[in-house]
Every structure is written in structure tokens, then in C-alpha cells.
């Protein structure tokens, strides 16, 4: 073989080996990515993936100008429940000390995200007032001097629940912690204590902090008795109706019989607050907490703060 031919063959062999090495490195890199991808997918589902499946609007109102002093528990209750519901896969919008405009915007945000098949939770903590056998959630800027003001200034629980139903929600859950003795009760003769029975739309489950017409004064704890017992029972492997009924009994016992929450259900199927217990909620449709935020109890809402559209 000539010297020139020898060097040509040698160069070709070297080039071939180099290309083979590059190919092997590329295959190895892709294999590494493929191995990591499934694990990453377990912890980095986007919240958009589950936004139409489990939604919660949580409102905590504590600073009412007409009250002798602020309510400390509703905001603590809202923060604690928001954190717990995020841990259960809910996409949570929490608002604190909401005015009527804030509450209206929050409900509109919620309605815009509901799709057929959604499970939706509504929580309200603060002052509630009944008028004409209907319960109204009071915003912090409510000005109440006569019964007509309640309907004008407040937000009807039933109206919100029916709006959720009309958007195609699979099921609606409501926790109304508003049976407190409120600062408006002596301003008009026709005032009725406590909350009115809530007329639930179909496929809804509602728990109120006390029997209709009865008041429930706040305790000295960080959370109200209702929210304390609800948080204690959320991890039970039971349907939402089972959780609410367990909470009802626990509140009655914790208050030594002074407080008996009212539970109303028109559910047509089992709904579970633990995603793993619900066959209709697969891991691909749950909005989980990402790894970097899993230990952060911050109540910051991904949907914005009060006053933000």
C-alpha cells in the first residue's frame, strides 16, 4: 500500500470513530433525559392542567368598620383552609377583607374557570345576615341600616351556588362559617338571628356553622370551631359528605352541645376531597403542589389578590 493511501484510510477510520462516539454520547444524553422526565412529571404538573377540575374560592372577612373589634378568626380560617385545599389538589383563590367589589370580582374569576366536570368549593368566614329566608355574606364595606340594605349590600349564598351550577360544575361544596352575632342586628325590627336554611341546587353539599336561626360566638382559638374540626377531618378517607358529617358531630362535641352545624346535601354521587380516593380524578388532571412550594404554607393565590381582576 502506498503511503498516501495509508494516511487516507487512517484518516477515514479516525473520522468514523469520532462520529460513532458523538452518536453514542447523544443517545446517552437522550436516555438520561428520558429517565428523568417521568419523575419530573410527578412533581411539576402545571396548575393549568387541573384548573378546570378542582377549584376553591375562599373568602375571609375580619375587619368590619361597624363592628366593635375586628374578627381574628375568619382570616386565619381562610389561610388555613386555603393551604389545606391546595394540598388536596384544589386550585385556590383566596381573598381577605373583601369589599363587595372584591367579592364580585372573585366570583366572576371563579365562574370563568369552571368547566363541565369541575368540583367547586366556596368558603366564607365573616358576618352573615339572613333576609327573607335567604343568607347573605357581608362584605367589609357593607352599610346596613335597614333590611333592604342586606340584600343590596350583601352577596346571596344561594345566588353564588346556583351560578356555579349553571357553569356546569360536577359538584358544589360550600362551607359557610358566618353564624356570628353581627353588628347590624339592632338596626331594624325584622332582624332574624343566625343564618337561614340554604336551598341547595342539585349536586351540592353545604355545611353552615350552626343550626339555622342560631348564633355561634367565636372562641379564643386560632381557628373557629367549625374550621378547626373541618381541618382535622379533611384527611379522612371518606367522601365529602362523610367529612362534613364527621365535622358536624365533632363541632357539637367540642362545643359541649352549644353549636350544631347544619349539613344539607343534594349530591347525586360520591365526591372525595382526597384526590386519590376519587376514581374520576386521575393524576394527570390534578393540580398538585410543585416541589419548590410544597412546604410553603403561604396563602398567596395564583389567581390574584383582592382588587385584582
Regions from the PLM with identified roles:
Residues 2-309:
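Cysteine endopeptidase catalytic domains of the caspase/legumain-like
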Amino acid at each position: 500500500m502506498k503511503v498516501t493511501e495509508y494516511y487516507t484510510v487512517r484518516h477515514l477510520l479516525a473520522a468514523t470513530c469520532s462520529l460513532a462516539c458523538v452518536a453514542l454520547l447523544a443517545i446517552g444524553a437522550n436516555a438520561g433525559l428520558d429517565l428523568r422526565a417521568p419523575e419530573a412529571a410527578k412533581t411539576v404538573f402545571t396548575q393549568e392542567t387541573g384548573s378546570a377540575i378542582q377549584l376553591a374560592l375562599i373568602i375571609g372577612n375580619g375587619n368590619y368598620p361597624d363592628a366593635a373589634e375586628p374578627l381574628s378568626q375568619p382570616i386565619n380560617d381562610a389561610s388555613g383552609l386555603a393551604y389545606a385545599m391546595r394540598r388536596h389538589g384544589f386550585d385556590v383563590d383566596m381573598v381577605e377583607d373583601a369589599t363587595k367589589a372584591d367579592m364580585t370580582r372573585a366570583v366572576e374569576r371563579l365562574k370563568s374557570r369552571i368547566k363541565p366536570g369541575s368540583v367547586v368549593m366556596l368558603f366564607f368566614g365573616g358576618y352573615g345576615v339572613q333576609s327573607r329566608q335567604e343568607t347573605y355574606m357581608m362584605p367589609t364595606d357593607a352599610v346596613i341600616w335597614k333590611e333592604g340594605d342586606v340584600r343590596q349590600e350583601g352577596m346571596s349564598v344561594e345566588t353564588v351556588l346556583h351560578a356555579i351550577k349553571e357553569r356546569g360544575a360536577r359538584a358544589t361544596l360550600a362551607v359557610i362559617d358566618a353564624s356570628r352575632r353581627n353588628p347590624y342586628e339592632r338596626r331594624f325590627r325584622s332582624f332574624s338571628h343566625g343564618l337561614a336554611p340554604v336551598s341547595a341546587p342539585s349536586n351540592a353539599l353545604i355545611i353552615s356553622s350552626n343550626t339555622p336561626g342560631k348564633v355561634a360566638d367565636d372562641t379564643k382559638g386560632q381557628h373557629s370551631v367549625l374550621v378547626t374540626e373541618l381541618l382535622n377531618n379533611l384527611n379522612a378517607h371518606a367522601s365529602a359528605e362523610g367529612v362534613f358529617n364527621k365535622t358536624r358531630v365533632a363541632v357539637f362535641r367540642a362545643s359541649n352541645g352549644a353549636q350544631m352545624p347544619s349539613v344539607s346535601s343534594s349530591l347525586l354521587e360520591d365526591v372525595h376531597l382526597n384526590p386519590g380516593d376519587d376514581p374520576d380524578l386521575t393524576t394527570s388532571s390534578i393540580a398538585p403542589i410543585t416541589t419548590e412550594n410544597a412546604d410553603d404554607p403561604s396563602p398567596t393565590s395564583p389567581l390574584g389578590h383582592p382588587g385584582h381582576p
